[in-house]
Structure formats: structure tokens, C-alpha cells
């Protein structure tokens, strides 16, 4: 991963952690940015796993995506789950791919 991408991912991670605090269990980068096969215009895909998933927590994730867009003029997209939801979904095809290719932040 190049240093520019690392800085962008760190911004997203740090911003999200400051907003969600202990409610954030895991943050995983997945997709082309994690695999290293991205191209110009590729977005940054994240899985956000929360202890408790409440509307205000989802709003904090969306606010972080907007801040990312405003700062870097690039898109990020987040799948937001609570721990139980992730436990069920990680066995589905997308979850298997995320577990295999994702980078835990």
C-alpha cells in the first residue's frame, strides 16, 4: 500500500474511532484497495463492526464517509454490522472474501 493510501485509511480509521469510541469492535478494509488491484476512481470499502448498532452510530459512520469525501474527493463505502450480524454474515460469500482478503485496521 502506498503512503498516500495509508494516510487516507488512517484518517478514516482515526476519525471513526474518535466518534465511536469503545462501541467500535473492528474496522476492516476490503475490496480492491485491500487487494492492491484498485484503479483510478476505486472507492475505499470498509466493514464497521459495532458492539451496539444504533441509528446514531450509523450516522457517525456516514458522517465519517462525508468527511473523507470532502477531504480527499474520493468515495468510501461502509458495511455496518453489530457483532451478531457479522458472525452470521461472515460465512456468506462476501464475508468469506472479506475474511480472506481484508485488512484489519
Protein language model regions, located:
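Catalytic core of pol beta-like nucleotidyltransferases
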Residues: 1-26, 35-40, 50-105
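Conserved H-loop
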Residues: 32
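Short beta-strand->loop micro-motif that forms the acidic, two-metal-ion catalytic signature
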Residues: 45-48
